[in-house]
Every structure is written in C-alpha cells, then in structure tokens.
Amino acid sequence: MKAFILGAGLGTRLAPLTHILPKPLVPVFQKPLIQHTMDFYIRCGIRDFIVNTSCLPLMWERAFPEPTYRGCPVYFSQEEEPLDSGGGVKKIMPQVPQDEPLLVHNGDILTDIPVAELLAAHKRNGNLVTLALRSLDGKRNVGFDEATGKVTDMRHALGVNPGTHQFAGVYLMDPCVAELFPEDDKFSIVPVWLELIKRGKVGGVVFDWAAWHEIGSPEMYLDAVLEMSSRERIHPSATIASGADLGEDCVVGQDAVIPAGCVLDDCIVWPRTHVQPGTYRRCILTPRINVQL
C-alpha cells in the first residue's frame, strides 16, 4: 500500500510560519512534521510514499535532497498551483497500484491512527472510501451511523445529518474511485465522496482513543507540541547560556543559540535561531520572525 501525504496547500491559517516553510515541514521536536508521519507509517508496514508539493519547492529539496526517506521511495508531485483535495489525488493516480487501496493523509495532522484497523473495516464493509473519524471535539460536519459503519452525510449537503463526527484527516480510497473524478484538474474531493455516500460506499471508523493533533494555526501548533511528551526537547547542538532561564516545556532546535538574559516559557525555538535577550512566553521563535501568541 502507498501513502499519499497532502503537502501542497497554501497553509494560510498557519501563516506567517508558512511564509518560511510549507506546513508539513514545520519542526515538531527535532524533525519536520511530515517525517513523524512517515516514521509512523513505516512502523505500520508502509514502505512507499507520495507527497504533493506546491509552495516553497526549495524547502522541500532541502528537506529531501534525495527522493527517499529511511530507504523508502518518495515520489514528489509538484503542483504549479495547489490543485485542492481532489485534484492532487487525481494527479498522482498514475503512480497508484490498481489492486489495493490508497492511504491519504492530510499533511497538517499528527496521529497514530492504526492503518490495519482502518483497512480491516474498509474491506469488511465493502467500502470504496473509508474515513477516520473523531467525535470528541472539533468541527462535527460528518454524519455517521455507528450501527452500520456508514457515512450518511457531509457538511449537511445531502440534508440527512447535520453532523455527528469530525473527519480526522486520514482515509482509504479504492483506485476505481478515480472514475468519478471530473475532467477539471483542480477540484475538491468532497463532491466525489457525496456521490459515493449516496451509493452507500463510504464508511467510517471512530478513533477517539488515538493520539491526534492538528497543526492548523500557530496556536494549534504550539499547543500540540507542548501537549506531547518527548525526550528530544533540547537538541544537543543547541547553545544555551548558563544565564538563560528555560521552562521545562520549551522545545529548542538544532544549532539554536539562547544567550544569557533570556527567559523562555512555553516556547518553540526553531533550528538555527539566535534568540535575542528578553522574556518570551507562548512564542514561536524562528530565524526570521517571532510569533507571539
């Protein structure tokens, strides 16, 4: 099975950080967000990746100087302009085997939703699309019948259900779904799903117990990192003066420099950032800008 990670969005909600890096490349602890996703899927047995890109292509080249990651091939699909959630999938379909589902993962989601459980439900229920869902919080715009395991509506577009669950940003899709794609190169995947919902071919699995973080805005990014536990909060190459005061939840990246006179609390310091003396609370510090929250 191949995993397709959506990385071509403009990332407007995460601006101004996405003026520096595409959203999937923002650092989470000591590596880019997308590498956490790839590491998890490698542990799940996936060994083949596709990533669509658009903005800041040079940053992608720096992050992946070769089209591989940990020995696994990575095919990069460059879009001159973002093709939306459906157009991006359509563009990479020639790279997708026709005899197995495609796993699609939103590039701003960090989760450990198990592929095996999603795949088992996909096959068991005869779905063409199976969505990972949540019911704990967030925007509930997916109608889901837990008794049947079927999705019954989305965004109340069919007038069936105003929404009981949230789409978790991960789904499986049989390649034959591409037969329903419009001729346009740029389009949303949602109308395709709605057509399949009417045919009873879209299922869902609720993963409220799984770890799940959306890196959608600077505040969501900071909160997600602060909520996660990691032994890699301070990179060993970082220089932290004895006169600097760092809160225990701060994350400091590679080759960052924090001089005496700095007080940091609940902050993320990106790699190669030279922090100026001062007091920072709930702040994301980068080599170019600081984002105060």
Where are these regions (language model features)?
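N-terminal glycine-rich phosphate-binding loop and ensuing alpha1 helix
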Residues: 1-60
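Residues at the starts of beta-strands that form the adenosine-phosphate
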Residues: 2, 47-49, 73, 101, ...
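Generic beta-sheet signal
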Residues: 6, 28, 52, 77-79, ...
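A structural signal for short hydrophobic beta-strand segments in well-ordered beta-sheet cores
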Residues: 25, 142-144, 204
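Glycine-rich phosphate-binding loop at the start of an alpha helix
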Residues: 35, 86, 90, 261
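Conserved beta-loop-beta/alpha segment of the NTase-like Rossmann-fold superfamily
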Residues: 60-146
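Catalytic-core segments of class I nucleotidyltransferases/pyrophosphorylases
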Residues: 100-103, 110, 115-123, 134-137, ...
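A structural motif detector for beta-strand N-caps
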Residues: 232-246, 250-252, 256-258, 262, ...
